[in-house]
Amino acid sequence: MTAMPTPEENNELSTNTKKPIKHKKLIIVLSLILVFIIALVSSFFIMVKIGEIRLKNSLVSSVKVEGDSEEKFDVIYHNGKKYKYNENLINLLLIGVDADNKDKEYQGQADALYLVSIDTVKNKVKITGISRNTMCNFGMVGIDGEVYSTEYGQICLAFAYGNDDIQSSENCVNAVSDLLYGMPINGYYTLYLDAIAKLVDSVGGVEVSVDKNDVDTKFYTGNSKSLILDGKTAYSYIQARGNSNAPRVERHKKFITGFINSAKRSIAKDLTLPFKLANEMKKYSVTDIDITSAVYLATEAINWDIEFVNIKGEYGIEDGWETFTVDDADLKDVIIGNFYIEI
């Protein structure tokens, strides 16, 4: 006759039976968490890739290259050599508007224009500054959104001759594209002046190099070659123009470099910062860059190697206003040297 198990043996048997069940549940939970993480990471990288593809395939500028036999901005000849457009580039136009917000009666002017060219293979970024006073052709936009005539004047006015923020931005894109012999432009980001303070404070300030001729004396102590701008001082630093726009363009370059460096450090500490800024800046900006493309740009920006490109020209005065006329020969060299590959 088999002996019945004691109460102690029953408890031990019950405990041993429960352990594998608990372990099995734990394994299932951990597996589900792992699957979720893999799916999340995969979705992120898929989103990044979609963003890259969308940017590369998008085209805002409608201007075609003068003299091209093909509809594509592709192969050209220069000084007896053959060049092909670098298809690894994504060109984005950054437009700074001299108005405090986008909900206004005054449309404003394009006070700052920078073509940001991203080489997606080399992770190099070239920023071409375009003076607000550059003389060029730009469209006059009617109330129906169509361009009904062309005006010759300062490129900053291209923004003023749109009926709303989108039309004004696209008018600037087409003016810049036309100036650069039909350069393809994949997107734009238009930022209003009152966004500067919030941007600067969000990255903990921006360090710039200064001298007594470079900035308002109230910000220059004479004891240092650099200055850390907070939101308030940054606003004044980039806005002041004086008698000429040329010194301000140089300050803009210093500010952009300093901001990018601060942003890289801040993003390394908080990977959600680009998304927070994107949401915050909606009140102060207009863009045709969608969320997937923005995610792609944010993830790539940390590794960017940045270089500024200058366009030579001649300053002058016309009807009391400063003008800047580009040197056509230098402009062609800039375009060939930075946007094309010899073949």
Residue map of PLM features:
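Hydrophobic core
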Residues: 36-38
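Membrane-interface anchoring determinants
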Residues: 18-24
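Non-catalytic, solvent-exposed segments at the cell envelope interface
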Residues: 2-9, 13, 20, 30-31, ...
